[in-house]
């Protein structure tokens, strides 16, 4: 089975419940989901913040895991204070800056900026994006968690990504014992949108 998990507070759920405000809380919530669905031998795939989430999940609940795939992520993801401030104020410039840092050629996306289509209002920016940025910035257990990974792991990075550059990616991969790395050329941070077919092919090979 392939399951895409929508986190509490994401998307339309913001009207019902607030976002989980830490990586630790998200990992605990994921475990409750997997218990409810009675899932074992998991292959977890995370992108960006999702990499921190599966890192922390692995640290706490490794018995459920079979493999891990980290896409455009690292063991730590500090966020510039100016970006956090813009997001907390609901400023749309926060989304524009994210796309600029993630991929300089973001204007080349057919149909426009994909992040702007997901995060559409000042409320989305202040109540979803700002919470997630703070969660990433405050997470501090990534180094320890990465060193304790025991299952086979794949790391996929975008050559042009400035949010998680290749230097950071190499440092992350060096922490994980049983891992291999794939770099997608001509690609920024939004790997699953920019180079969906190549990413999917590499994951299936893994």
Regions picked out by a protein language model, each given a short descriptive name:
Residues 85-150:
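Conserved alpha/beta-hydrolase catalytic His-Asp/Glu region
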Residues 1-9, 14:
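Single conserved hydrophobic/aromatic residue that forms the stacking wall/gate
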